[in-house]
Amino acid sequence: LNATPSSQFHSALAFYAKAVVLATFALIFIGGLVTSYQAGMSVPDWPLSFGSLNPEGWWGEFPVRLEHGHRLFAAALGLLVTILCAWVWRNGWPLLIALLIAVASTFAAKTLHASPVVLMHLGIWSFAGTFALALLVMRRSHPSVHSVAVRFLSFAAFLGVCLQATLGGLRVTMETAHHLKAALLLRVFHGCVAQAELCLLVLVAALLSRGWISGSWKHSGSKLGAVRNLAWVAVVAVYFQLIIGATLRHLGAGLAIPTFPEANPDGGFLPKVHNIFTDLHFAHSRLGAITVTLLVISLVLLVLRRAR
């Protein structure tokens, strides 16, 4: 992730990247509200909402407001992330070309009487594929002043937001079709990918910051080696904790073990009853929480020691 000598600081782009991070955090927060209020199926169709882009009275009914608002916000964020990627690559032509191809392919499929769901998935991935291909083909005629790392991460974030749109749509259509197990897996996957998307965008914003590009963050490799390794371990542990937590949340098993810190009503550390719900809860609220806490504290102490 090192900044290359050709990297240049652009204040407007750096500010925009930070704004996209904040917007992504806001969208994840809204998505969490959708789950908390069980509003995900308050709008049972997709990509439209009750057959419309702007259903009548959607603001007046709270669950519908949450779900439809989440969709509108997600669509806006998809556009923001796409613009960020094109800006990092310093080439707006792929954006225009991809838009034209996506519209043309969707229109062609519509003449064959494809369903709105098929049309939306086709539009998303024809746009993504064309955008990716155009970026690669035109990269020599429009060289970026930014490092390979930030270009790669911005492109990964673009693909991530396309994947999120697909997962969100499939989650609704699968549940509408009563494929409940598939819908549950998609809900968990959708929530976990959202956090990964946020991390990607935070990395992009960091790599575009003045401090990173100026190199004021740099330390010798010998000092960073142990910190880097422990940081990776902590990231993996936190993400596993996230996956288990999302699974518990979407299974509705947040109170599978209703006592804390004891996992046993009789006062023991281990749960008295063992099933998928209690075991997941114990792994998340006890083992995972302790492991992540120790790793993060160790990482902070190591960073402070190496920074002396």
Language-model segments: residues:
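Individual transmembrane alpha-helix segments
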Residues: W59-L80, H274-T291
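Hydrophobic cores of alpha-helical transmembrane segments in multi-pass inner/ER membrane proteins
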Residues: A76-L84, I124-V137, C192-G211, I290-I297
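Membrane-interfacial, low-structure loops and terminal tails that flank and connect transmembrane helices
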Residues: L1-H10, M138-V148, R210-R228
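Membrane-interfacial catalytic/cofactor-binding modules of polytopic membrane enzymes
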Residues: I243-I290, V296
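Extracytosolic (periplasmic/ER-lumenal) interhelical loops and adjacent juxtamembrane/interface segments
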Residues: T35-H68, G254-F277
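Membrane-interface helix-loop-helix junctions at transmembrane boundaries of multi-pass membrane enzymes
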Residues: V88-I97, M138-L153, V300-R308
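Interfacial helix-loop-helix junctions of multi-pass membrane proteins
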Residues: V34-V43, K110-I124, T166-R187, L248-P258
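N-terminal signal-anchor transmembrane alpha helix
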Residues: A12-A39, V236-L248
